[in-house]
Amino acid sequence: MRVFEGRYYGEGLKIAIVISRFNSAVTKELLDGALDALKRHEVKDENIDVIWVPGAMEIPHITRSIALKKKHDAIIALGAVIRGETYHFDVVANEVSKGIAAINLEVDVPVSFGIITSDTVEQALNRAGIKSGNKGFEAAMVALEMANLKRQIEAI
């Protein structure tokens, strides 16, 4: 029996981070967490591309464009969608989630999901590492694991 499991090893990996500028107080924390994880696991600065987009709705479009180029081993999608007083939150959260899921099925480049959905700014900041855990760090770890697992599967 053979068992395949991704590793948290970044040497030689090229990673793209697509990040929303909207809610930047939160997304900058997510970016810091993702960069911390990548650097701790040997991904060199010159192998990290950070692409800023206006808002969460633009993340899937640019993520797909980058994935289709197949120049990165994994892509990390980072953003923060915070509930307001209208139905807009539900639309944005659902469409961004569906968009990233579709890219993962369509294009052969793993995309990790580091998009926070929360009811308040305080909740979003907490999930971005202000109190504990950083979803950007976690998304980067998923990207490393999936990139390495993909390499193993390709070698079968």
Curated annotation (Swiss-Prot):
EC numbers, comma separated? 2.5.1.78
Residues annotated as binding (2S)-2-hydroxy-3-oxobutyl phosphate: 85-86, 127
According to its UniProt record, which reaction does this protein catalyse?
A: (2S)-2-hydroxy-3-oxobutyl phosphate + 5-amino-6-(D-ribitylamino)uracil = 6,7-dimethyl-8-(1-D-ribityl)lumazine + phosphate + 2 H2O + H(+)
Q: Where does 5-amino-6-(D-ribitylamino)uracil bind?
A: 22, 56-58, 80-82, 113
Which InterPro entries does its entry note?
LS, LS/RS, LS/RS_sf
- The active-site annotation reads 88
Keywords in UniProt for this one? Riboflavin biosynthesis, Transferase
Record-given protein name: 6,7-dimethyl-8-ribityllumazine synthase
This protein's species is Kosmotoga olearia (strain ATCC BAA-1733 / DSM 21960 / TBF 19.5.1)
